[in-house]
Amino acid sequence: MIDLHCDTLADWKYANTGNPDTLDDPGRVLQLSNMPNDVHWAQFYAVFIPDEERGDAAIAYFEKNRINFYRQMEKFSDRVAPCRNAADMEKAWAENKTAAFLTIENGSALAGDITRVHTLAEQGVRAITLTWNGENELGSGHTTDHGLSEFGKEAVREMEKEGILVDVSHLNDHGFADLLEVAAKPFVATHSNARALCSHKRNLTDDMIREMVRRDCLIGLNYFVKFLRDDGEVHSLDDIYRHTMHFFELGGKKNLALGSDFDGSLLPECLNTPAKAASIYEYLISRGVSQENADGVMYKNAQEFFRKNLR
């Protein structure tokens, strides 16, 4: 199973808990200790940076969490391994370890300095969500109206050059349109759903989805109740199925993956543990989804994308 987004690593939601072992904290939804033993798991661990952290403060915030990520990679090395690409992930799985990818949620970590793209790539960052909800040096999130800045466009080009995946989750519609003019390689939406089924601006329009399919991009289904249904009343995996089928109908059978948003959002009871998330597979099969397509959503689509786009 491959999950393209969680907020488990950073301590923003659990301030002052006194537990630096964020990856195996019993107070968190996602823990190394509660991942199903019979499932090979790969996880994108995002360093979420609040919008108010800018410049040197954003760099310091990232550095604190980056150091803690690698400290935990060493402490829990019998259960988890840091990964940069598909080969690393497959090696971790062969050793019965969780495959951990370091990512960033909010391009403010660049602090407006294009040379930091290379620095972050060297530090093992594999994806950067260009914006969070508000504005940063790269552009605007879904609560604002501006698109990508000139620096944002330059950053996209540099990320592609350095092998860091460009993540458009949180980017507003204007910014998405700007990105299409700049991006030369497949990009990702690590945790976004279909706006046709849930009208929140964080979700992708049908035109966006079609364009991402055309460009061989990757999209992770988000479990947040308010991104699954307008009323937020999610009581079964039927809403995951509905979004899955909508993506399939738009040609996305090879583009759809999972992006839980564990420890960063309000989850429905049916998806509030890793074991319950793993049950998505059986549910899709029970609703008539083929084994090939269910495997694609759970891991194969992301695995193939990594093989082609992560070096």
Label the model's feature ranges.
Residues M1-N222, K226-L228, Y241, M245-F248, ...:
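Extended, charged catalytic domains and RNA/DNA-binding interfaces, predominantly
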Residues F48-P50, G264, Y299-E304:
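A short, acidic, flexible beta-alpha connecting loop/helix-capping segment that sits on the rim
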Residues D56-A57, D230-E233, L266-L271:
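Second-shell loop/turn segments in exported
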Residues N68, H246, L250, V297, ...:
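Short alpha-helical scaffold segments that flank and stabilize functional sites
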Residues Y223, G251-P274:
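Short acidic/histidine-rich active-site segments
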Residues N272-R311:
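Mid-to-C-terminal alpha-helical segments outside catalytic/metal-binding sites
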